[in-house]
Amino acid sequence: VDDRHVVTKAAYNTPVTFCEIFPPDNFPLYFYREPSAPDLELTWEDLPLDAIRDASIFWISVTGLSKEPSRSAHHAALGTRDRRRFTIADLDYRPMFWKDKETAHREVSKILPKVTVAIGNREECEVAVGERDPERAADALLEAGVELAIVKQGLEGTLAKTRTERVEMPVTSVTTKNGLGAGDAFGGAICHGLLSGWSLEKTIFAASTAGAIVSSRLECSTAMPTEPELLELMRARRDEVAPGLTDL
C-alpha cells in the first residue's frame, strides 16, 4: 500500500467503530465520528488529481457524498477522472451518515453518470435509483449511465448486467462466523477481476467466493483471501455454482 497521498486533519479525531457479532446474520456497527470525521473534511485541494486521473481503477463510496466539503471533493475527483475505464461507485448506504433517504438519493443520482461501474445491495440500489427489484435496479443503473451494474442479493446471490451481458451468480455456501468485511472482499475481488481481464462470470464468481471466505472467518482485514486460495475454492465449488465456467 502506497501511503504518499494520505493527508491528516489535525482538528478531528480518528474515527472509531465497534462491531458486535451475532452469527449468522446480525453484525451491528457503532460509529464514533463526531463532530465530524477526517474523511468527510477532505477538500479538492487535498486530492492528488493527476494520480486519480491516471489510476488503473478508481473506487469511491457514496458515504463521501453525505457532507461537505467531502461531497465537492468527490465531484472534483470524478470530474478529473472523466469516466475513465473502471471508475467505480460503491453504493454503500449507511443511514446514520445522511439527513434522510431523499438527500442520499439526490446526491447519489448526480454521480451515476460520472462512473462506469456501480455496486450495491437491494436497499442501496433503491436509494440510488428508486428500484429494489434486482433486474429493474440493474437496468435503472445502466440507464443512469453506468456500464456495469452489480446488485448484491445476500443469500440469493449476485446479479451483474452490462448492456450486452447478464450474469446471475448463486452464493458460494459457507458457515458464517462474521459477515463484517465480506463486502470489502467482494469489492476487492471485483477490482482484481476487472484489472486481470477476467470474464464477467469469473469476476462475479470470484467476488462472491471472496465474500464467502471472509464471512466464514472471525476476522475482517486479516481474513482476506489470496488469489491462489480464492481460485482453489472456486474450482472446488464450480460444479455447483458456475458449471459453465471454463477459465479456472
What are these regions (language model features)?
Residues 79, 130-248:
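Conserved phosphate-binding/catalytic region of the ribokinase-like
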Residues 1-62, 231-248:
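Conserved N-terminal subdomain of the carbohydrate kinase-like
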Residues 9-10, 94-95, 155, 229:
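Conserved beta-strand edge residues that scaffold enzyme active sites
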Residues 50-53, 113, 144:
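Structured loop/turn residues at beta-strand edges in well-structured enzyme cores
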Residues 57-140, 156-158:
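Conserved beta-alpha-beta core of the PfkB/ribokinase-like small-molecule kinase fold
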Residues 3, 85-87, 149, 166:
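Hydrophobic anchor at the start of a short beta-strand
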Residues 18-22, 104, 165:
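Short low-complexity, flexible loop/linker segments enriched in glycine and/or proline
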